[in-house]
Swiss-Prot record:
Protein keywords: Antibiotic biosynthesis, Dioxygenase, Iron, Metal-binding, Oxidoreductase
Keyword Ribonucleoprotein: no
Protein name per its UniProtKB record: Validamycin A dioxygenase
Catalytic activity: validamycin A + 2-oxoglutarate + O2 = validamycin B + succinate + CO2 + H(+); validoxylamine A + 2-oxoglutarate + O2 = validoxylamine B + succinate + CO2 + H(+)
Organism field: Streptomyces hygroscopicus subsp. limoneus
EC primary class: oxidoreductase
Function of the protein: Involved in the biosynthesis of validamycin B, a component of the antifungal and antibiotic validamycin complex used as a crop protectant. To a lesser extent, also able to convert validoxylamine A to its hydroxylated derivative.
Gene assigned in the entry: vldW
Length: 365
């Protein structure tokens, strides 16, 4: 236990007897009710693979602008590169219009349903740079581990609430997710910062859970709680920070908190410090209808049922509309998408193409 952010060992949870599991469940439930986060040990992601993923991702940002630009995000439902602009996969609070001081490279699952319009919205093609073949190879291995861990965490969270282990994962069999490599440049790189400007402004994430592998820094992550205000969560080498997102807050009908967090601007006391975070945003099946849990398991907030895909797309459009208004996004806000190298041709889509009963298959990308 480190303050209000506990360390939870996944293997210890799995091996615990009824009494010890009840004790662990109380700790996890308390942390998610008050803050919305905990540290995860025993997750089984190889440290060597994590290091390679960080190195491969960081290499992308060293490419010249003209090499990165073809991989830029162009639509709300897109993967690829986002430059030094204010962009998010979260609920935005705003920081006076100053752009966030980071770049990001996003990638997603390789699921395919066979319906081009549906896939373009929910399983868009990845944009792998030809100059960095190791990025694709490493990312596929790393995200396979992160998807495994996300499923294990969702099973554990069901256990914390006294639900069947598959309660959450049964709605996540073909979940949408985004793996982001976030590069936070040094102060020497970005120059003087504007008042109130941050690497990432205060926000909550859109999805169910986020798995964060971060680096320790002078100007790093801060989380918020009503009791403590803003504070830096403990850094423990080899652990992942598990953050709850808006969908899980909704699903538990307010019992658990969607973590409010931010990343501070680079500090004048460490002008050469740059950080790279590996952020895995996990949602649920895009066609899933999330019905808030009834009391006493749910929090009794009276939240409505939501559709996962519609909710995520709506928030992405809201985010990019805000950016476009500030001249920080040059792409399209339409939900139609032309084909890519992976999927030639054009794939127009309606607002929410539905594929009831369809199960996407894993395929190469």
């Amino acid at each position: 236990m480190t303050g209000s952010v506990p360390i939870v060992d996944l293997e210890a949870w799995r091996a615990a007897d009824e009494e010890n599991r009840a004790s662990l469940a109380e700790i996890i439930d308390g942390a998610l009710h008050t803050v919305g986060t905990f540290l995860l040990a025993g997750h089984g992601v190889p440290a060597e693979l994590t290091a390679r993923m960080r190195t491969a991702g960081r290499s992308f940002f060293d490419l010249p602008w003209e090499k990165k630009e073809p991989h830029a995000v162009q639509r709300p439902h897109d993967n690829g590169w986002r430059g030094l602009v204010k962009h998010r996969t979260d609920t935005i609070e705003g920081t006076g219009g100053a752009p966030d001081l980071h770049e990001a490279f996003h990638m997603g699952p390789t699921h395919r349903t066979g319906d081009d319009a549906f896939d373009a919205l929910y399983y868009p093609a990845n944009k792998w740079p030809a100059e960095l073949p190791e990025l694709r190879e490493t990312a596929l291995a790393y995200t396979a581990h992160m998807t495994r861990v996300a499923g294990a965490v969702m099973e554990m969270l069901a256990g914390v609430l006294g639900l069947e282990p598959a309660f959450f994962t049964s709605r996540c069999e073909h979940a949408t997710w985004t793996q982001s490599v976030n590069w936070y440049p040094s102060l020497d790189t970005v120059g003087q910062t504007a008042e109130g400007q941050m690497r990432v402004g205060p926000h909550t994430d859109f999805g169910t859970i986020t798995l964060l592998d971060r680096q320790q820094g002078v100007s790093g992550l801060e989380v918020w709680s009503e009791e403590d205000g803003w504070f830096a969560p403990p850094f423990v080498e080899g652990t992942l920070l598990v953050n709850l997102g808006d969908l899980m807050h909704q699903w538990t009908d307010g019992r658990w908190r969607s973590l409010r967090h931010r990343v501070l601007a680079p500090s004048a006391s460490a002008p050469q410090e740059e950080l790279v975070s590996l952020v895995y945003f996990f949602d649920a099946d895009p066609e899933a209808e999330l019905v808030p849990l009834a009391a006493p398991v749910g929090g009794g907030a009276g939240m409505p049922t939501v559709n996962v895909g519609e909710t995520i797309l709506k928030k992405n459009i809201q985010m990019l509309t805000d950016l476009k208004g500030h001249g920080l996004f040059q792409g399209e806000l339409s939900l139609s998408r032309p084909g890519s190298a992976d999927s030639p041709g054009s794939s127009p889509a309606d607002d929410h193409p539905s594929r009831p009963g369809r199960h996407p298959a894993q395929g190469p990308q």
